[in-house]
């Protein structure tokens, strides 16, 4: 059975388009082929049938029972050099279910909310580094906040030598992967040859070894000096047990920590940078948001930010208009199925295109416009709005990411007055494994009197 139509260019050329110009590539495919088309991304991603209609996504994401569709970890693609083979993203079947069951508790309820003061403290300290009115890169600032939150809330590190070493090494490694050309070895496995520390792959391997050494040292220290009172995610994972009473191995812990880092650092920083841009690009949005934030009491509980409708709408619209992840996790067809009039056979690989779903004018009128009110006027199904993916492969850190985004924004906006520094038009662009706004700069000063959050 023939697959749906798609670009006729070679898989290498399509992969280069995907790496360098993913947005225009997807839009061009959609204009020519409609809501379903096939792309060929070579050795790292293979052949994918992409769907951008909510009805198709409902079928795909609601049938993850391995009867109609399966989501094998082998489809983790270019992420394996970063996250390893034992993380929740790289596992399948019963192993994947076990990993999710062990990982979910730290990201829900009071455990997650206990991180509010930590997030606020990190945000305050980072923002104060550029006072008064020192221009700063918005995205770099948000990356710093995101990385420090992960090191403290996930890794459980306090400031010290190991913290400083990991911050420097992780920051440098992740920044190097933000260049699509430098990150080429992730997309083309044949480029993974060690020609020394001055070449991209060799440099990556050396930094990864240093990072792994520090992570394994931290795991060993925690095992040797167990402290039940600790609430960081590494401590909770160390004490977690599956249904058989088995704990996570050191390798599993390392891979899960790196997965949480890769999944949570770049995505959260990008979403925060975009939010700051739109809020300050559109004064009406900023003023309305500040008015709502003033209603927060100084002693409000940690979940109060989720009860602010306009803040929630601004965050949702930010994640809609420029989703960090362009596709859902791929699924493999297990049984013959008709999807939107397309016949799919076992072995075909399908994915939902989040970017195109979020740009559908029949779902989101005037989709190019930043309009938080759309999320106040109607409810969107999980197949129309899915910035964190869906089904059994939905991002496990979704609740934490949403909580962090709202807490950071409320802390910045109530504590500081920010303004955009005029420059080139801000556009969305590819950054290796993710997407991000093009560089833009801001300046900040203390908001007086300071509003407590």
Question: Where are the language model's segments positioned?
Answer:
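Cytochrome P450 fold signature focused on the C-terminal beta-domain
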Residues: 226-231, 290-308, 321-342, 351, ...
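Cytochrome P450 heme-thiolate monooxygenase catalytic core
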Residues: 1-4, 68-79, 95, 111-270, ...
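Cytochrome P450 proximal C-terminal region
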Residues: 30-31, 123, 171-172, 294-296, ...
């Amino acid at each position: 059975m023939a697959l749906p139509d798609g670009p006729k260019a070679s898989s290498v050329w399509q992969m280069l388009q995907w790496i360098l110009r993913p947005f225009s590539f997807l839009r061009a495919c959609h204009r020519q082929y409609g809501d379903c088309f096939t792309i060929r991304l070579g050795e790292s991603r293979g052949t994918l049938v992409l769907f951008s209609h909510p009805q198709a996504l409902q079928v795909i994401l609601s049938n993850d029972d391995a009867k109609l569709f399966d989501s094998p970890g082998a489809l983790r693609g270019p992420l394996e050099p970063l996250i390893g083979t034992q993380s929740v993203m790289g596992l399948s079947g019963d192993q994947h279910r076990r990993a999710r069951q062990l990982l979910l508790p730290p990201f829900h309820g009071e455990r997650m909310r206990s991180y509010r003061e930590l997030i606020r403290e990190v945000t305050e300290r980072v923002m104060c580094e550029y006072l008064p009115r020192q221009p700063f890169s918005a995205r770099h600032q948000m990356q710093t906040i995101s990385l420090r939150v992960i090191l403290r809330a996930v890794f459980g590190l306090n400031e010290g030598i190991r913290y400083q070493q990991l911050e420097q090494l992780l920051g440098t490694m992740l920044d190097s992967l933000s260049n699509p050309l430098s990150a080429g070895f992730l997309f083309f496995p044949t480029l993974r040859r060690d020609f020394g520390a001055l070449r991209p792959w060799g440099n990556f391997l050396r930094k990864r070894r240093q990072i792994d050494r520090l992570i394994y040292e931290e795991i060993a220290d925690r095992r040797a000096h167990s402290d039940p009172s600790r609430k960081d995610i590494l401590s909770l994972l160390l004490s977690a047990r599956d249904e058989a009473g088995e704990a996570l191995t050191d390798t599993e812990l390392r891979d899960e920590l790196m997965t949480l880092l890769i999944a949570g650092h770049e995505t959260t920083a990008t979403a925060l940078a975009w939010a700051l841009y739109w809020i300050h690009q559109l004064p009406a949005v900023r003023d309305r948001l500040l008015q709502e934030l003033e209603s927060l009491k100084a002693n409000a509980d940690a979940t109060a930010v989720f009860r602010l409708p306009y803040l929630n709408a601004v965050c949702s619209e930010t994640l809609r208009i420029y989703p960090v992840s362009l596709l859902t996790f791929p699924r493999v067809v297990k049984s013959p199925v008709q999807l939107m009039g397309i016949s799919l056979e076992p072995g075909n690989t399908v994915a939902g295109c989040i970017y195109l779903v979020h740009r559908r004018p029949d779902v989101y009128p005037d989709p190019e416009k930043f309009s938080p009110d759309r999320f106040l006027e109607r409810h969107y199904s999980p197949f129309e709005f899915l910035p964190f993916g869906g089904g059994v492969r939905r991002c496990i850190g979704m609740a934490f990411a949403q909580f962090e985004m709202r807490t950071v924004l409320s802390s910045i906006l109530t504590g500081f007055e920010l303004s955009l520094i005029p420059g080139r038009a801000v556009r969305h662009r590819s950054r290796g494994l993710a997407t991000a706004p093009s560089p833009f700069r801001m300046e900040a000063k203390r908001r007086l009197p300071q509003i407590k959050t």
